[in-house]
């Protein structure tokens, strides 16, 4: 063990290995089998998942992935690699003995394998940074579960720090604000990934974090209450999810006199299928077809300098 080397584990959701039906099916099976994501009784849910959902959804989702796939592969993985390298470069410039690894809750590279690489490199401490600014049991807690699994075969568990959330971190808020320049008569819509309403009732304070993030950004930009709103996207299944829903809101705004909209997905640290296809394409078409005149998607923070600096400072506070 190198007593001076610090390990950093960047963690995100994950992606299929390739945009094919078999690869997407494997990915969705792992993702949707996580009880943190879907907490229905296991036997009942596995029957529904294997015999009703995967066969229908996998080809459709694979087609959507093919539309956003790049030469570097999945946008989420490519951008996450850029974030990993940018943070490694940052710590190298600071002459800090820090090793940054990347792991995904589902798919490759896994959080378990990233944890193993850090331990084999001899780090004396691991700082786990889930790239989810707003805590949720469906995302952040899944990272903790996977990290714990990565330690199960270790005789010596090194000390670790787990960054729970950073929804109100000043540098993160400033990084978001720096990407937003509203045009005249343009309304700002914060679209966060949804979760079942029941999860909030049972104690998940994710929606509170989302509202706080949006309010802080709006305050930073000196926006009035009429200039912005919060919605939730990507609902799945028949259960009620957090509302208002992004798609329904965008379809009704033009009839309420809102003709110009800018959409930012502040909970996504990297652009992915949900932002590049669902928000930037599908919902744009719906808004314009409903009578909207201008629709602008503001990209995720990805590997931009302000974002990397904000993440680096979060990590440095734990070193």
From Swiss-Prot:
GO molecular function, one term: metal ion binding
Catalytic activity reported: heme b + 2 H(+) = protoporphyrin IX + Fe(2+)
Entry's localization field: Cytoplasm
Pfam hit, one: Ferrochelatase
Main location: cytoplasm
Known role: Catalyzes the ferrous insertion into protoporphyrin IX.
PROSITE patterns registered for this protein in UniProt: FERROCHELATASE
Entry keyword set: Cytoplasm, Heme biosynthesis, Iron, Lyase, Metal-binding, Porphyrin biosynthesis
Pathway given in the UniProt record: Porphyrin-containing compound metabolism; protoheme biosynthesis; protoheme from protoporphyrin-IX: step 1/1
EC number: 4.98.1.1
Residues involved in Fe cation binding: 193, 274
Gene Ontology biological-process entries: heme biosynthetic process
Family: Belongs to the ferrochelatase family.
Annotated Gene Ontology cellular component terms: cytoplasm
Protein name (Swiss-Prot/TrEMBL): Ferrochelatase
């Amino acid at each position: 063990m190198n007593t001076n080397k610090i390990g950093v584990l960047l963690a995100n959701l994950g992606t299929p290995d390739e945009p094919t039906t078999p690869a997407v099916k494997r990915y969705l099976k792992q993702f949707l089998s996580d009880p943190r994501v879907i907490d229905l009784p296991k036997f009942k849910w596995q029957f529904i998942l294997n015999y009703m959902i995967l066969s229908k959804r996998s080809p459709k989702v694979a087609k959507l992935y093919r539309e956003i796939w790049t030469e570097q592969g999945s946008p989420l993985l490519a951008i996450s690699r850029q974030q990993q390298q940018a943070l490694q470069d940052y710590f190298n410039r600071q002459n800090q003995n820090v090793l940054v690894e990347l792991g995904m809750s589902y798919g490759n590279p896994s959080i378990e394998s990233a944890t193993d690489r850090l331990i084999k490199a001899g780090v004396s401490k691991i700082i786990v940074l889930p790239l989810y600014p707003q805590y949720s049991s469906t995302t952040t807690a899944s990272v903790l579960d996977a990290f714990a699994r990565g330690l199960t075969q270790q005789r010596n568990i090194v000390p670790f720090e787990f960054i729970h959330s950073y929804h109100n971190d000043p540098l993160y808020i400033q990084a978001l604000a720096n990407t937003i320049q509203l045009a005249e008569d343009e309304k700002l819509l914060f679209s966060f990934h949804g979760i079942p309403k029941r999860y909030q009732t049972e104690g998940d304070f994710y929606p509170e974090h989302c509202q706080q993030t949006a309010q802080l950004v709006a305050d930073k930009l000196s926006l009035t209450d009429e200039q912005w709103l919060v919605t939730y996207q990507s609902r799945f299944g028949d259960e009620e999810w957090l509302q208002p829903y992004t798609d329904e809101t965008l379809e009704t705004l033009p009839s309420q006199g809102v003709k110009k909209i800018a959409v930012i997905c502040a909970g996504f640290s990297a652009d992915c299928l949900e932002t590049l296809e669902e928000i930037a394409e599908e919902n744009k078409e719906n808004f314009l077809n409903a009578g909207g005149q201008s629709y602008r998607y503001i990209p995720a923070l990805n590997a931009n300098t302000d974002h990397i600096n904000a993440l680096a400072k979060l990590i440095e506070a734990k070193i």
